[in-house]
A protein has these predicted regions:
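Bacterial N-terminal signal peptides that target proteins for export
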Residues: 6-23
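C-terminal motif of bacterial Sec signal peptides marking the signal peptidase cleavage site
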Residues: 30-34
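Bacterial signal peptide processing site
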Residues: 36-39
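Secreted/processed peptides and extracellular or luminal domains of membrane proteins
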Residues: 41, 58-59, 95, 107, ...
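N-terminal secretory signal peptides
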Residues: 41-91
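Short, charged/polar surface micro-motifs in flexible loops or helix N-caps
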Residues: 91-98
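Extracytosolic low-complexity repeat regions of secreted or lipid-anchored proteins
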Residues: 100-170
Length: 170
């Protein structure tokens, strides 16, 4: 006597439902785990400039120990949660200033410190300009500028900072 076991339709239906629930649960867990909070950053006036897009696509995923996360506006980026570094492309290019200007990897940055110690570093001589805001007590400006200068250099330089020594000769 031979016995043939046929799977019951109810059993297959239960297995299918269980598999669907397991797959859906795994998908949701993975999706939620990989979601970083969105940083609210206002877009700069010239954020739609095509030169910003060329720079934005080559921004690094990490600065120091801070990972890049999504932002709420075009041509913006943020690293860290809470944000340690915030970048906006399309800000107004700075004119002549007495604020210090540093050159990092052939990109000039004008540095401005506010009363609370937060620094705003803006590319000089590039249009559109790129603005980076950071707290140097949380992440070193040297790390930030060294990491971002390659991306910022995608917007061609039209001017350079003038050193104090060169300015005194005029």
């Amino acid at each position: 006597m031979s016995l043939t076991l046929e799977p019951s339709p109810n059993r297959n239906l239960k297995i299918g439902r269980i598999a669907s629930v397991v797959l859906l649960g795994g998908f949701l867990a993975t999706s939620l785990a990989s979601c970083a909070s969105v940083a609210s950053v206002d877009a700069a006036p010239d954020a739609a400039n095509p030169a910003c897009a060329e720079m934005m696509v080559v921004l690094p995923e990490v600065i120091g120990d801070a990972e890049r996360r999504p932002t709420s506006s075009q041509a913006t980026s943020a690293w860290g949660d809470p944000s340690q570094v915030v970048l906006r492309c399309g800000v107004e290019a700075p004119g002549p200033t007495t604020d210090p200007c540093v050159s990092v990897n052939n990109v000039d940055w004008v540095a401005h410190e506010d009363k609370s110690g937060i620094w705003t570093l803006t590319t000089y001589g590039r249009t559109p300009a790129t603005e980076v805001v950071l707290d140097p007590n949380v992440i070193p400006s040297s790390t930030v500028l060294a990491t971002l200068s390659d991306s910022a250099s995608r917007i061609p330089a039209q001017k350079q900072c003038t050193s104090v020594e060169k300015a005194e000769k005029f």
